[in-house]
Every structure is written in C-alpha cells, then in structure tokens.
C-alpha cells in the first residue's frame, strides 16, 4: 500500500463524488467560481513566443481574445481586442511588425505591452490601452491565476525532470470531448486500466514500480519501462519503441513516463525526450476542451521528424483509448442517474490512489458551495 492508502482503508472509505456532480450545471458553475478562478491559471509556455517581439494568439482562451507576447525579459498576456471597434487584432503566431500591435481595420496601434500609441484622424489621443496581465513563471510555464505557483510546487520531487530548457514547441492541438472534465482527470490519475485497456502503452510502461508523490494541489505518477522496450504491444507503439531505442543507442530510458497533475486541470507529461502539457477547459457540465502542447529537445525538434511522428502517433492511440473509457464511464453514470441509483466501487491501491487524492481535493475545495 502507498502512504496515502496507509492513512485509510481505501476499500471502506468513499470520497467518491456524487454522480450528479458530473452533469449538474450548478456544480459546473461552482467549479468555475471556486476552483478555476482560484486555481493556477495556466496560460502557455514561454516557448510559444520564444524571442523578443514574438507573439501567439491563444485561440482556446476567450475566442482568441488574448495574446501571449514576449517583451524581452518577461512574457505578458495582452488583450487582443482593439479598443476602438472591438475587433480581433492578431491572428495565429509570429513577430510583431515594428514591435507594435496594430489593428488592421483602422490602424489603431499599441506597444507590445498594450500602451495605446496612435489613433489616425483623431484630433485628441483617446489613450485607450489594451489590458495586460503579468504572469508567474515556473519551468517556463506561465500562469495568471491566484495560486502562488512556486510555493505550490516548491517540494515537487520531479521538477528537474520537467525542465523545458533546450526544448522547442512542435505543435499545439485542441480536442473537444463530450463528457465532464473531471472524468478525464480521473482516467489520467489511475493506472489500474493501463494493462487491460492500453495494449500499446501497457507494453511501453510498467506500473509494477508505480511511485506516487502528492501535495495539496498536485499529484505525480512515475512508472517504469516495460521489459526494456523489448515487446511492443501494438504496431503504432512498435515504431515508437524503435525510435526511442535508436535515438538512445539501444539503452532503455530511466522511466517509462512521469505524469504530473497540477489541480484542477493542468497535466505535464514526461516521456523519453518528450514533454507534453495538456490543459482541460470546461465548456459546461458535459463538454470540455483539451489543449495539448508537444515539446522536444532542439535536436529532435529540428532533425528527427520520424521520432516526432512516432511519438505523436503513439500518444494519440492512447488518447483515443482514454476517450473511450471516459465515454463509457459517462454513459454508465448517466444511466445510473436516470435510474435513481447512486453506485460507486472501491479504489484499488496503489493504482487508484491518485483518484482518491483528486476526489478529496474536489470535496475540500467546492464541497461547501454545492
């Protein structure tokens, strides 16, 4: 049993969340107000705008209403909505022309920090600056929330493994799901299904040496390498095994995976020579959007396209399997709810200890508000 399990008999105590909490708009509203508005508020990574003058529009936040801007020694979150006629200014990502943010509609211009510079044909300067937010930074990850991120993660034992120094952003993907965001986190936080449901991942990692690390606002799973990557469990993972071993000259990696969850919705994943950040954004009680960022060491990002392709294909294979689990759980919970039944099973320790920790976190933070 893990340290968490030793504090309780997991099969006898039940911090499980009521089934209605996965479907109730009132609970969804409470989560937004008391969890997300008081959470770390992950914005993006510094590598999204790596050089001074670079910007990236965060399409998944407020319909592209904010842009991440590199202002030399720091990154800022600057409003991307013109103060004149409320038009979106910047698109996609790139470098600010002349170092200024200029709306294409009427040529209103702003500094890279949002200060209003010019309004053509106006006799008096309106002085309408773009709102700007300063950001916290941890391992290159940028936050605008109310948590003290450095304090929350000060004792994180795997911080050095999640160091993005020398890594480049490869791509950002968004995926929409038709289930509650908590269901996704639950599946991410339990290893009990890895063997039975993930033929590829289950032969890449082994949960036999699963180690947990837990803090008030996070948990970490570290799992080992399965059979020195000698027996791939799927054709897709076979390519990923081959690329990892080729790049490492036949030497297995030190870990199979490290999975950090920074509550409520930020996940950082370590795989051999890969770092992935994914962030869940609720869109109501039965919808959520996952924003996935892939980062690789510069050498791999620039010169190893086969490595990148194999890793992402393996990642997506596992993601599709996880989605099926989430859909099945959602269908089952809805069936019970419609039938007026409240049923919950036991937690398996240590493989579902993270789910216990998450359920206790949710109850602690919003229980009094729902």
Language-model regions: role of each:
Residues 23, 74, 314:
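Conserved acidic
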Residues 21-61, 67:
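Non-catalytic accessory segments flanking enzyme active sites
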Residues 1, 5-19, 165-167:
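Short, contiguous pre-domain boundary segments
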Residues 69, 79-80, 134-136, 141-143, ...:
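C-terminal catalytic domain of Rieske-type non-heme iron oxygenases
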Residues 38-43, 50-51, 115-121, 259-264:
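Short Pro/Gly-enriched beta-strand edge/turn motifs at strand-loop
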Residues 48-147, 154:
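Rieske [2Fe-2S] iron-sulfur-binding domain
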Residues 19, 23-24, 37-38, 45, ...:
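Generic structural "secondary-structure junction" signal
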Residues 36-40, 87, 193:
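Generic structural signal for secondary-structure transition and capping sites
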């Amino acid at each position: 049993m893990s340290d968490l399990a030793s504090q309780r008999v997991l099969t006898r105590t039940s911090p499980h969340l009521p089934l209605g909490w996965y479907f109730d708009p009132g609970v969804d509203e409470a989560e937004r107000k008391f969890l997300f508005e008081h959470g770390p508020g992950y914005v993006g990574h510094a590598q999204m705008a790596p050089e001074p003058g670079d910007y990236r529009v965060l399409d998944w936040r407020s319909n592209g209403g904010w842009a991440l801007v590199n202002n030399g020694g720091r990154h800022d979150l600057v409003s991307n909505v013109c103060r004149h006629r409320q038009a979106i200014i910047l698109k996609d990502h790139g470098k600010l022309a002349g170092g200024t943010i200029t709306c294409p509609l009427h040529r209103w211009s702003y500094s890279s920090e949002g200060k209003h510079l010019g309004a053509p044909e106006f006799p008096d300067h309106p002085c309408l600056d773009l709102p700007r937010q300063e950001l916290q930074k941890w391992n290159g990850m940028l936050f605008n929330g109310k948590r003290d991120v450095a304090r929350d993660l000060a004792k994180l034992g795997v911080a050095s493994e999640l160091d993005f120094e020398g890594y480049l952003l490869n791509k950002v993907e968004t995926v929409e799901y038709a289930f509650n965001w908590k269901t996704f986190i639950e599946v991410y936080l339990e290893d009990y299904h890895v063997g039975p449901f993930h033929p590829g991942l289950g032969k890449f990692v082994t949960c036999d040496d699963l180690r947990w690390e837990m803090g008030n606002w996070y948990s970490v799973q570290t799992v080992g390498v399965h059979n020195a990557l000698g027996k791939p469990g799927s054709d897709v993972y076979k390519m990923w095994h081959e690329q990892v071993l080729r790049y490492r000259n036949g030497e297995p990696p030190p870990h199979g995976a490290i999975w950090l969850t920074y509550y409520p919705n930020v996940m950082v994943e370590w795989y051999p020579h890969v770092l992935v950040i994914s962030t869940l954004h609720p869109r109501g009680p039965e919808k959520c959007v996952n924003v996935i960022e892939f980062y690789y060491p510069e050498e791999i990002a620039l010169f190893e396209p086969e490595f990148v392709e194999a890793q992402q294909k393996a990642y997506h294979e596992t993601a599709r399997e996880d989605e099926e689990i989430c859909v099945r759980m959602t269908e089952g919970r809805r069936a019970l709810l419609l039938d007026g039944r409240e049923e919950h099973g036991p937690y398996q320790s240590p493989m579902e200890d993270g789910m216990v920790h998450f359920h206790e976190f949710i109850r602690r933070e919003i229980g009094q508000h729902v």
